[in-house]
Amino acid sequence: MPTACYVGTDGEKFYQYTMIEEASRERFIYAYKEASSYSTVDFVQRAIIYFGYAPEMIQTDNGGEFTHTQKTNRSHPLDILCSRLHIVHKTIRPKTPWHNGKVERSHRNDQERFYNYLKFYSYEDLQIQMKRYLRRSNRIPMSVLSWKTPIQKRQELEAARFC
């Protein structure tokens, strides 16, 4: 998560969750007051609404908000949701953040384009500004997409799917 997700006069810390659609590189981001399994489940449900479909696979690191960090017979809430929605939940190997390179790069971009330049006065203010930023960031052309924006690429992929 970006390093400067602090807001308010008390320096409250918030946590940015990020989902990237692999083919179009379109992103969905949302901030939470805690990094927990409940926030994770809520985020995945919000992302499904945002994208309009459930992904085939979700890849995460091994944080406790995504998976159990100790052996247990209990299922993690994210795994329960994924099972119910027929989503494969893949975790990267521990201590290998480069295996989540697209998300890590997007967090660096968020830091440079968003957190370094804006101040947030409350959690609500952060959410409002984050929504605006997400709209803008999904409209930035990317070299990997032949200088199309993620939104343009998604529209292109959807048009090809219905032909």
Report residues per predicted region.
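C-terminal domain-tail junction helix/linker
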Residues: 85-87, 109-163
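Short, solvent-exposed loop/turn segments at secondary-structure boundaries
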Residues: 31-32, 68-73
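Acidic/histidine-rich, metal-coordinating catalytic segments
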Residues: 53-70, 93-95, 147-150
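Active-site beta-loop-alpha junctions of metal-dependent nucleic acid enzymes
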Residues: 12, 29-53, 57
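RNase H-like two-metal-ion nuclease catalytic core shared by retroviral integrases
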Residues: 61-62, 72-82, 89-112, 126, ...
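An active-site-proximal beta-strand-loop segment
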Residues: 1-28
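Mobile genetic element proteins and their domesticated derivatives, centered on retroelements
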Residues: 2, 19, 25, 44, ...
